[in-house]
Amino acid sequence: MRVLIKNGTVVNADGQAKQDLLIESGIVRQLGNNISPQLPYEEIDATGCYVFPGGVDVHTHFNIDVGIARSCDDFFTGTRAAACGGTTTIIDHMGFGPNGCRLRHQLEVYRGYAAHKAVIDYSFHGVIQHINHAILDEIPMMVEEGLSSFKLYLTYQYKLNDDEVLQALRRLHESGALTTVHPENDAAIASKRAEFIAAGLTAPRYHALSRPLECEAEAIARMINLAQIAGNAPLYIVHLSNGLGLDYLRLARANHQPVWVETCPQYLLLDERSYDTEDGMKFILSPPLRNVREQDKLWCGISDGAIDVVATDHCTFSMAQRLQISKGDFSRCPNGLPGVENRMQLLFSSGVMTGRITPERFVELTSAMPARLFGLWPQKGLLAPGSDGDVVIIDPRQSQQIQHRHLHDNADYSPWEGFTCQGAIVRTLSRGETIFCDGTFTGKAGRGRFLRRKPFVPPVL
């Protein structure tokens, strides 16, 4: 199968050019002008449009069971939504398994979830929920099998203490893996939450007040120091929501420490006032939404290069689940927001079209740097001969208002309802196959492939 994309502006992280793009058998074969492929081929006219590498979302939670509820997106509905939003690869954060389970247990469970369902290519981050000799011995074998990143938690049921974190950092570093971490100070959060509950203060606003930015920033600073103690182990901070944490990361990077950080559209575009609305419970996520001042600090990091990746932390629970389980108490509400379908459009509209970032920086944040950090480059995140034919075409002339009824996940609401975006996803191709076109999903369940990722190699800081 041959596909020729003509008359568009092809953009990579290192530059852009008005040129044509030829995909053959799922692989990019040629870029240039006046390409004359062998017949037969499909021709796509991208006049006036940007032709970007397909998005790489390295933070999703499909099929996750958090004990009190299971997310309403599985690997079909979740990856369908991703495809319709221009994302062609996801790396899913596996949820916790049974107490005492091995790393391989969760990998087998999640491969079972995704097989025959995923629409786009996918991989997983391992999750380390406890430390013992068997787990430490298992890590190198998992890296050899293509899992080159693992997540630690400093909060929730399977939080690790400092000694366990150090053991994990050392072994992951030795094994060629990248440590990712959810950084929040669990003890401080528990104390604040208990105070509010004892006082009968259980409205959504108290979720944010029980998890102040200092809880997140302290944990970020602690992880940076522990990574240094562990032999300058590489570290990736997920879902950054505040400027103080970013300051600590800037300092670490100035000291040549290998640290990277992601943020999410919700921390750039939503703020804590959402908790005071009638539907405040729909915005319960951790870390919580912050104030507009923190948004501005994150946008500075997006613009000046201090933030490396924009992912989603897509974790969907319906409003029915939230209301039934929480009964008006923030501490009982399952955490997470949908957003895998909106990431690319929101960042393009609020970043590129406002002049905050260039189209090249857009590629770096949404596909190139995620692919490089997580062992997928240059197969993903790049449009060059030999790379996968993963493409998203965005028309900057079109304006769209986000409406839940037009989205493709399995949620019953969207936190982005009513947002007007300048720029529309008009087509998504995965390995040369059109899986979304002009508002219609055209992919098939099970066509996505499991990606064995390469060991971690740090990009140049």
From Swiss-Prot:
The protein's organism comes out as Escherichia coli O139:H28 (strain E24377A / ETEC)
- Chain sites annotated for binding a divalent metal cation 2: 151, 182, 239
Q: How is the cofactor bound?
A: Binds 2 divalent metal cations per subunit.
Q: Which family does it belong to?
A: Belongs to the metallo-dependent hydrolases superfamily. Hydantoinase/dihydropyrimidinase family.
The record's NCBIfam families line, in alphabetical order, gives: D-hydantoinase
Where is a divalent metal cation 1 annotated to bind?
Answer: 59, 61, 151, 313
Lineage of the native species?
Answer: Bacteria, Pseudomonadati, Pseudomonadota, Gammaproteobacteria, Enterobacterales
UniProt EC number: 3.5.2.-
Q: What does the entry list as the binding residues for substrate?
A: 156, 286, 335
Q: Per the record's keyword annotation, is Hydrolase included, yes or no?
A: yes
What name goes with this protein? Answer: D-phenylhydantoinase
Query: Which Pfam families does this one have?
Result: Amidohydro_1
